[in-house]
Amino acid sequence: MPSPDVAKRLRSLNLTAGSLHLVSAIAIVALANNFSLPVVARYEAGQPGIGKFQLVSYGSVSTALLVGLFFALSAIAHFTVAGPRQASYLANLDQRRNPYRWLEYALSSSIMIFAIAQITGVSDVAALI
């Protein structure tokens, strides 16, 4: 286990980072406009092979809400390791592992990849998932 002094500094750092990420998430959502990007799918219409397709819209996704969710997940992760899971977090750090951060990265990076794909023009549901 890290020393009590190191554990205290890590807790303080995680609480600070979590607070900043939470404030960022709230600000992004509060200042958001109604900008959203579509999610669509193309289905064959008619006989296979003739090249006739029907475009179906599944709705749209708010870019600001995606970015806000990204920051909110980071805040939750920081608060989790600073609070209820701190002992487990410190024990894992002592073994040079950080599974909480990897879980947060897995979730938040998926959201960010989705958002970046949409911003660059990808709207097909098959490509987005």
Where are these regions (language model features)?
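Hydrophobic alpha-helical transmembrane segments of integral membrane proteins
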Residues: 97-120
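N-terminal topogenic module of multi-pass integral membrane proteins
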Residues: 2-93, 99-105
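Helix-coil boundary and interhelical linker segments in multi-pass alpha-helical membrane proteins
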Residues: 52-59, 113-128
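Structural signature of hydrophobic alpha-helical transmembrane segments
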Residues: 65-69, 124-129
